[in-house]
Amino acid sequence: MSEFIKKRIRELVDLINYHDYKYYVEDNPEISDYEYDMLYRELVELEKQYPEYIFPDSPTQRVGGKVKEGFKEVVHRVPLLSLSNVFSEGELYDFDRRLRELLGTDDFNYVVEYKIDGLSVALEYENGLFVRGATRGDGNVGEDVTENLKTIRSIPLKLKDDINIVVRGEVFMPKDEFIKLNQEREENEEPLFANPRNAAAGSLRQLDPRITAQRKLDIFVFNVQWCEKELKTHDEALRYLKYLGFKVSPDYVVCSNIKEAYEAIKKVEEKRGLLPFEIDGAVVKLNQLALRDVAGSTAKSPRWAVAYKFPPEKKETKLIDIEVNVGRTGILTPTAVLEPVRISGSVVSRATLHNMDYIRQKDIRIGDTVVVQKAAEIIPEVVEVVFSKRTGNERIFEMPKKCPVCGADVIKFEDEVAYRCTGVECPAKSYRLILHFVSRDAMDIAGMGEMIVKNLFERGLIKTPADIYDLKFDDLVNLERFGVKSTNNLLKAIEASKKRPLDRLIFALGIRHIGQKAAKTLAEHISSIDDLFTITEEELLKLPDFGEKMAKSVVTFFRQDQTKHLIERLKKAGVNTVAEKKAKSDILKGYTFVLTGALSKYSRSQAKEILESLGARVSESVSKKTTAVIVGEDPGSKLTKAQELNVKILYEQDFERLISAKSHEEVEKILME
């Protein structure tokens, strides 16, 4: 039986790795997502039951569960040198002349490749298994990012040959993933990445591999650094790398001489804007590997290769108008409407103006002649005004005082750049608000994930959080992948959410600057949500840890007619809007706990809520003042910190005894054991 199980696990590993290669490397999937998911699920279940049969190249081993304290240093077996740059045809011909003089022969050719704008890494394989991956660093010493690199699905964990080899590649973020990531960061009010290269570097150097896995990075392998197998040309090496299972630099061209190489470079430049990934030039490499040894290297760069860098393409055009778009968090963003102009291979008719401060600093006006370029070759932006072409008929732009989508007030805090719509029912931001409303820390509607919300939203069945409570059986049962059982479960979850405490509802409303802690503070100082419609900024500033921004945000939010309408609908649906009289008990008052890892019976937010309802304080960090750390499965660095500080460690069974304690003496006894 055990041999049969082991054989089946091996079959699944090989099969899934094959389909990963077809999907992520060749972009030619042979099975549906559903079929793939079923294979993967079978493998996960078998590995759970038989962990002794987990193979190192199993696709389940790509994402580790532990957060690192830092990255170890790795000394590269072969230095990862940087390339010297040229910027013109003349400089390219000078490179060719120097190389011919150095080699004393014309009997060689070149390979021209894309210069991918990403992060350079070395991948090391022993007997065909991926054992180590490191960043370039200073060329001699890099950082060990093996676990993070395993999350990149186009990196094979096992090669077709059992060979020892070190290869070099460029990790990058595809353009569409970069745009998606920045949209998500904007919605979460996190700093945006300036370009795909920064996004790739920041993603690869995450201490938590799970974050890296979410970022959808990719890689092109472009060089054999060291290999047991004898290879004669770079062209042969690339073909061998592809055979082994690597995703190699695409569309490379073998050129007979430098003239052909320059022609290939110009073709690359013509299509750079149409590529799904970012490039900042082309690389010209000597093809014959033996001659590379003759040419040698300087301390920083090889003499046998050069990077031809492309300048950012800029064009003049007319700014016809400025439109205002409203994002999912309510931020108003000005967009330039342009006379169409071709830049980097595509026609541009709209460009970002970033924000109102940017418009003022650049003195951009409607009717101006402006210079447009593609930021990081992706997002068109207005970079400057051609003041010499001003006629006097240009118009100064002002941000609207009312939301162009829903008509609610637009506000701007003094120390912020952004202008925001305050409307709680604004269609432009309601999708994101609904996702927040149903989330675990808010109304905790189990089973109402992003796909369900998106489906309901696109069908027009929900437009505001209140619409959730109007959903009927017939609305849900016909949704994709929904049946009678899942429909009934979701309706039960929606019904259960009506009984959530008031602080959960306040947090669920998505009020700017009001997190869980502030929502709890508000709920503790009012009798019902109705009190917030008349509360003043002065009264709010008297509350613990309430600042001016928070106070202004609450008052502005609850003065909107849309808010009043939403609360009335929630009340009518039976959602609790009244504060609890008092905490269940103060038996844990004076104690501070930290949670780490996953408890089997309680979510993190549920455990926190229970502890706080008993008077305890729950902290995010461990210190000498921490009473105890409650540890679940797969704990993080907090456990290590607790052990270093000699802080009491409690497990799930201790937690359950603690919250069931009837007296302070019983609590002390548990903590002293």
From Swiss-Prot:
Q: What are the record's GO terms for cellular component?
A: cytosol
Q: What does UniProt list as catalytic? A: 115
Which of this chain's residues are annotated to bind Zn(2+)?
403, 406, 421, 426
Record-linked InterPro entries: BRCT_dom, BRCT_dom_sf, DisA/LigA_HHH, DNA_ligase, DNA_ligase_AS, DNA_ligase_CS, DNAligase_adenylation, DNAligase_N
Q: Entry's Gene3D superfamilies?
A: 5' to 3' exonuclease, C-terminal subdomain, 6.20.10.30, BRCT domain, DNA ligase/mRNA capping enzyme, Helix hairpin bin, Nucleic acid-binding proteins
Q: Does the keyword NADP apply?
A: no
Give the EC number.
6.5.1.2
A GO BP entry is: DNA repair
Q: Does the keyword Hydrolase apply?
A: no
Q: Domain BRCT: where?
A: 583-672
SUPFAM superfamilies (alphabetical)? BRCT domain, DNA ligase/mRNA capping enzyme, catalytic domain, Nucleic acid-binding proteins, RuvA domain 2-like
For molecular function, the Gene Ontology terms on record are: DNA binding; DNA ligase (NAD+) activity; metal ion binding
Cofactor(s) for this UniProt protein: Mg(2+); Mn(2+)
The UniProt annotation places NAD(+) binding at 33-37, 82-83, 113, 136, 170, 285, 309
For this UniProt record, the keywords arranged alphabetically read as follows: DNA damage, DNA repair, DNA replication, Ligase, Magnesium, Manganese, Metal-binding, NAD, Zinc
By its UniProt entry, which NCBIfam families does this protein fall under? dnlj, PRK07956.1
Read off the PANTHER family from this record.
CHROMOSOME TRANSMISSION FIDELITY FACTOR 18, DNA LIGASE
Q: Which family does it belong to?
A: Belongs to the NAD-dependent DNA ligase family. LigA subfamily.
Q: What is this protein called?
A: DNA ligase
